[in-house]
């Protein structure tokens, strides 16, 4: 652990220090399973899972148990019946970070690892993309160009959803977003029923405000971080690759990008980055980083080599 010259709410680790905290936590993920979890352009391997994600999964596992003891103590104080061990209060994890930084991969890997623990096997993952306003509503509000910014989300609906899950509702429904259509899928819902753990992944999940926010319901949060220049490079690289994958589908909203030359594609990607994604990152996403329980810092090669844990 890093020695800090002044008192700080954070503890900083390099990868060697962090991996020692894995203790004897077993790796129950195969290479084939990891391939299905890895995002486009990601270079995550089993070694990084062992050295970075297993210690993180162990930390969360310990915090889940501690949180349940805290809920039990509160119930005892209030004279309420002890909670049903088969229906514990769901543990909510937020995963935040920029477009193209790899937060979706982080969320999927955490889901896979945490679900392999017997006492919290029900782990659900929901992305906040489903809580974007439909394109028609964004157009009505004249904020289509601000898609992904905080005002483009139905934050009340998101708050109702997470509150329902946390409160033990029989089920809670999240809208479904299609990246192919670049819009909400009408009538389609993701139904969440009594999870032990809910992972909520999205750009703005750590946002604060004068009223109760979804981040106030988190028990743990992760911010995936990197240099702005590196994230821009990853975004452009992913855009180039998608010309022959997602964009190639005639049904894709972005099918018109599929035939761009490399030079044209780089120009288009850089324009989108500097007009939308970079401003959103600087104005709205990056300022929430200090609120995260854990910051995962990536180097230019995507490898996580530095971590910062909030201890207070």
UniProtKB/Swiss-Prot annotation:
Pathway-wise, it operates in: Cofactor biosynthesis; coenzyme A biosynthesis; CoA from (R)-pantothenate: step 1/5
Q: What is its main location?
A: cytoplasm
Pfam families in the record: PRK
Q: Which UniProt keywords apply?
A: ATP-binding, Coenzyme A biosynthesis, Cytoplasm, Kinase, Nucleotide-binding, Transferase
Cell compartments where the protein resides: Cytoplasm
Gene Ontology cellular component annotations, sorted alphabetically: cytoplasm
Q: Which residues cross the membrane?
A: none
Catalytic activity reads:
(R)-pantothenate + ATP = (R)-4'-phosphopantothenate + ADP + H(+)
Query: Out of the domains of life, which is the source?
Result: Bacteria
Binding-site list for ATP: 97-104
- GO biological process: one example: coenzyme A biosynthetic process
Q: What is its EC number?
A: 2.7.1.33
Q: Which SUPFAM superfamilies match?
A: P-loop containing nucleoside triphosphate hydrolases (SSF52540)
MF terms in GO: ATP binding; pantothenate kinase activity
- Family the entry assigns: Belongs to the prokaryotic pantothenate kinase family.
Task: Spell out the protein name for this chain.
Answer: Pantothenate kinase
